[in-house]
Regions:
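A cross-family "folded-core" feature that marks the main globular domain of proteins
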Residues: 1-177
Length: 177
């Protein structure tokens, strides 16, 4: 049996693709009378993710998965919370991150937001803005790409939203996203 180092992350971050991969493994085992292990669903899920974003590079999908998991860990540590990776809010956040990685890969970051909007987001959500800047550092370190101010502002909104339900009982948190 092959062990996939990102198996837990794939199951959590790409639950839909993993379910499809598992169904494919089950179908192949039924049709071929074989005994492919369930962990092969991880490889199939990663191929589905890769195909869905047309990067053509599975290593980019592995990197994206690791960076997303690292970002979620940073958010949890920064806010002192545990994010429910099965929640709609976390799924929306992960979807945003996946499209961010596509924009990075295509060298097409958001950059057309007027400065007053970017500044308004920063002042409206100072804690989420600080956290988003930490996430931008991860992107810089892991992918060697500096995020634009517009991307960081957009990321700020998503950080505020993903943490809002987990932190709504705490004072002075950014919970209005």
């Amino acid at each position: 049996t092959i062990e996939y180092p990102l198996e837990a992350e794939v199951r959590s971050l790409y639950a839909s693709e993993y379910a499809k991969g598992k169904a494919l493994v089950d179908a192949m085992n039924t049709y071929l009378g074989g005994a492919l292990p369930d962990c092969e669903a991880v490889a199939l899920a990663l191929h589905l993710v890769n195909a869905g974003f047309s990067t053509g590079d599975l290593s980019a999908t592995y990197t994206m998965t690791g960076v997303i998991q690292q970002m979620l860990t940073v958010i949890e540590g920064y806010y002192g919370i545990t994010l429910d990776q099965n929640s709609v809010n976390v799924a929306r956040f992960i979807t945003h991150l996946r499209y961010l990685f596509v924009r990075i890969h295509q060298h097409e970051q958001l950059d057309d937001e007027p400065e007053p909007i970017v500044e308004s987001i920063k002042t409206s959500y100072p804690k989420a803005s600080d956290c988003a800047n930490k996430l931008a550092i991860i992107v810089k370190m892991r992918l060697n790409v500096s995020l634009s101010e517009a991307e960081i502002a957009y990321l700020t909104l998503h950080v505020a939203r993903v943490t809002s339900h987990a932190t709504e009982s705490h004072e002075n948190d950014d919970t209005n996203a």
